[in-house]
Amino acid sequence: MFEQEAWQPSAPIKTLFTRAKIIREIRKFFTERGLLEVETPVLSEFGVTDVHLSTFNTEFIAPIGENSKTLWLMTSPEYHMKRLLAAGSGAIFQICRVFRNEEAGSRHNPEFTMLEWYRPHFDMYRLINEVDDLLQQILDCEPAESFSYQFVFQQYVGLDPLSAPRAELVAKAREHHFMCDENEERDTLLEFLFSTVVEPQIGQTRPAVIYHFPASQAALAQISSEDHRVAERFEFYFKGLELANGFNELTDANEQLIRFERDNRQREKMGLPQRAIDKRLLAALEAGMPNCAGVALGVDRLLMAALNANRIEEVMAFGVNNA
C-alpha cells in the first residue's frame, strides 16, 4: 500500500554514527577550552535584513484577547548569542538547527546544523587560529593556507577588487558568461567573480582562509582600522566548500543600525520585503557587548569534507526531499 513512498534515510546509518562521533568531538573541543554551551530560540519576532538571506515565518496564535504575531525561524543564532555576550556570558558556543528559505542543492538544505561560537577579547587572527585547530582535529588535515581577499582576487581574476573600475569588473564578469549591464552593483560583480573564478582555485588539498573582505561586504564585522577599504571578516574553504564565515564583531549600536537600514533600502531597490530591525540586539550592543570575534561553521558541510560526500543529504538523516 505504501511501498512507493521513499521512507529510507538520506544517509547510511554508518554515516550517522560518524556524524554523532564528530559532533561529540566538537563539543569536547570547546568544553576543554572553557566555553559555555548555550541554547537560544529557533523562533523570534525579528527576521534578518540581509538581502542574501530568505527566511521562513509562521504565525503564532496568541491566547484569546491577545494579538497573534508573525515569528521567524532563525537563519543563525547570532543575534541571541550576542545578547548573551552583552549580559556577561563570557565565551560561548552552540550547535543548533537553522533555517534558510533557499533552493535545495548539492551543498544546500533549507534546514541544516550550524556551529557558532564567540570569543570575547579575541581578534580576527586569534579566532582564525582556533578554527584552524578545530579543522585539523576533526578532519585530520594540514594547517590552513591564509590569503587576503585582495591577493587571491588579483591572482585569479587579474583585477584589484578594491580599486578596479566598475567597467572592468563588468567586462570580466561577461567573460565568464554573467549577464549584466553597465550599472550592475559592484558587490554583485565581486561576489560573482569570487565564487566563479576564485573559489574553485582555493582550498582543494588543504583548507584555505580568506580574510579582509571588501568593506561593502562587512555584514556584522568591524571595518579594519589599518585599511578602511576592508572588513575584519574571514571565510574558510576546503574541498570546494565554504565551511565557515567569521568576523571581528561590530559592537557599535549606531553603526549597526545604519547597516540594517542600508540593507532595507537595498531590499526595497531589489523588490524584496523590508524586515523589522532587531531592536533588542541594538539595545544589547548599546548596553555594552564586549569586543569579540565570532564565527559560524556549517556542520553538515564539515561532514561532507570529512567523508568526501558529494551531496549534503548524504550526511543528513533526511534531506528536504524526503523529510
From Swiss-Prot:
An example of a Gene Ontology cellular component annotation for this protein is: cytosol
**Enzyme class, first EC level, given as a word:** ligase
Q: Which residues bind ATP?
A: 100-102, 109, 242-243, 298
* Record GO biological process: lysyl-tRNA aminoacylation
Q: Which GO terms describe its molecular function?
A: acid-ammonia (or amide) ligase activity; ATP binding; lysine-tRNA ligase activity; tRNA binding
Keywords, alphabetical = ATP-binding, Ligase, Nucleotide-binding
EC numbers, comma separated:
6.3.2.-
* Record-linked PROSITE patterns: AA_TRNA_LIGASE_II
Q: Which residues bind substrate?
A: 76-78, 118, 249
According to its UniProt record, which reaction does this protein catalyse? D-beta-lysine + L-lysyl-[protein] + ATP = N(6)-((3R)-3,6-diaminohexanoyl)-L-lysyl-[protein] + AMP + diphosphate + H(+)
Which Pfam family is one of those matched by this entry? Answer: tRNA-synt_2
What NCBIfam families does the entry give? genX, PRK09350.1
Biological function: With EpmB is involved in the beta-lysylation step of the post-translational modification of translation elongation factor P (EF-P). Catalyzes the ATP-dependent activation of (R)-beta-lysine produced by EpmB, forming a lysyl-adenylate, from which the beta-lysyl moiety is then transferred to the epsilon-amino group of a conserved specific lysine residue in EF-P.
Assembly with partners or alone: Homodimer.
Q: Which family does it belong to?
A: Belongs to the class-II aminoacyl-tRNA synthetase family. EpmA subfamily.
Protein name, UniProt field:
Elongation factor P--(R)-beta-lysine ligase
What organism does this protein naturally occur in? Mannheimia succiniciproducens (strain KCTC 0769BP / MBEL55E)
Gene transcribed to yield this protein: epmA
